[in-house]
Amino acid sequence: MNKILLQCDNLCKRYQEGSVQTDVLHNVSFSVGEGEMMAIVGSSGSGKSTLLHLLGGLDTPTSGDVIFNGQPMSKLSSAAKAELRNQKLGFIYQFHHLLPDFTALENVAMPLLIGKKKPAEINSRALEMLKAVGLEHRANHRPSELSGGERQRVAIARALVNNPWLVLADEPTGNLDARNADSIFQLLGELNRLQGTAFLVVTHDLQLAKRMSRQLEMRDGRLTAELSLMGAE
């Protein structure tokens, strides 16, 4: 069995506005192993995105904890969480969030710049990742000059440029047509095999989720079942 990379222990999240309390997550517990490909399946409003924010240290749980590589997130300072996100975690969103005035190469290089890598390393590594996603020939193009599928591939290259241990992906194919969505999931699987990166993908699409090695279902802020989607139609 692979070493546990990330573990959730009874995560709860409650928002309060005035006298109104809204419970978004209820005692969520699960783990992700090194190199694992996992999907969390649920409809809009089920709590999937809130969960990813907690896993990435972008928000704080009301109770419970997230443990990454044996280290509780609750014990980390804001600076330590930021360093963790830069070095060990990657993020992919439904919208690519590329910087419009920068080229594909410059967008991919951004996490390396933040991590204060050497200039020569920054350029070579960013170009290496663009090649890995099949876009080295588009390195000097801005996002407005790329197709939707190409923009998402650049976003994936950016998420993986620092060799993270785990990538958190929030509906990564939600804005793509079926052909491009299929291409993106094939790419994630290939990067998992080549680099050993673990992926945790939240999605509402069963056809896409079945490509992952493990699937959990979320309803109304609760993990309700482990699914078996092999051969799902």
Swiss-Prot record:
CDD domains: ABC_MJ0796_LolCDE_FtsE
Recorded topology in the membrane: Peripheral membrane protein
Predominant location category: membrane
Pfam families in alphabetical order: ABC_tran
SUPFAM superfamilies: P-loop containing nucleoside triphosphate hydrolases (SSF52540)
Cellular localization per UniProt: Cell inner membrane
InterPro entries to which the protein is assigned, alphabetical: AAA+_ATPase (IPR003593), ABC_transporter-like_ATP-bd (IPR003439), ABC_transporter-like_CS (IPR017871), ABC_transpr_LolD-like (IPR015854), LolD_lipo_ATP-bd (IPR011924), MacB-like_ATP-bd (IPR017911), P-loop_NTPase (IPR027417)
GO biological process, one term: protein localization to outer membrane
Domain of life (superkingdom): Bacteria
GO cellular component: a single term: plasma membrane
EC nos: 7.6.2.-
Residues binding ATP, per UniProt: G42, S43, S44, G45, S46, G47, K48, S49
GO MF annotation terms: ATP binding; ATP hydrolysis activity; transmembrane transporter activity
SMART domains: AAA
Keywords associated with the record: ATP-binding, Cell inner membrane, Cell membrane, Membrane, Nucleotide-binding, Translocase, Transport
Domain ABC transporter residues, every copy: 6-233
Similarity-based family: Belongs to the ABC transporter superfamily. Lipoprotein translocase (TC 3.A.1.125) family.
NCBIfam families attached to this UniProt entry: LolD_lipo_ex, PRK11629.1
Assembly notes: The complex is composed of two ATP-binding proteins (LolD) and two transmembrane proteins (LolC and LolE).
Function: Part of the ABC transporter complex LolCDE involved in the translocation of mature outer membrane-directed lipoproteins, from the inner membrane to the periplasmic chaperone, LolA. Responsible for the formation of the LolA-lipoprotein complex in an ATP-dependent manner.
Protein name: Lipoprotein-releasing system ATP-binding protein LolD
Native organism: Escherichia coli O157:H7
